[in-house]
Amino acid sequence: LYPGVPRITLEEIVPGSPFIIGNPEGNKVEVTPLRVMHGKLPILGYRIGKMAWITDMLTMPGAEYDLLQGLDVLVMNALRPQPHNTHQNLKEALDNAQRIGAGETYFIHMSHHMGLHADAERLLPPHVHFAYDGMRISL
């Protein structure tokens, strides 16, 4: 091989089966893929340590909720107030956030139908927020 060419090892990702990612300095974190549904299409969300990233979700099988217990941070989609056939609306996202019970929840993947950020944010519980471009979250 040529110097500097990265070596890649492909690993199969299996929903519900954790794997470890890390860097050369030895920092490692466990990642657990989660089954979620984008309408009728199965996709994956991820629990990454004490944080989870779930986007493009409409529904999630009941067993996956068990894998999300004890989260500090949940990042999840909330498209708009009205129902949609492939994404959670605001009520569905709020219901799922309450069921999961993370310390803080951040909604992403919102459309302009959600309204102005400051106005819409006032409708959320204190531990739930609309994320924004450039936002930083401490883990």
Name what the model sees in each region.
Residues 52-56, 106-107:
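Short, hydrophobic beta-strand segments that form beta-sheet elements in well-ordered domains
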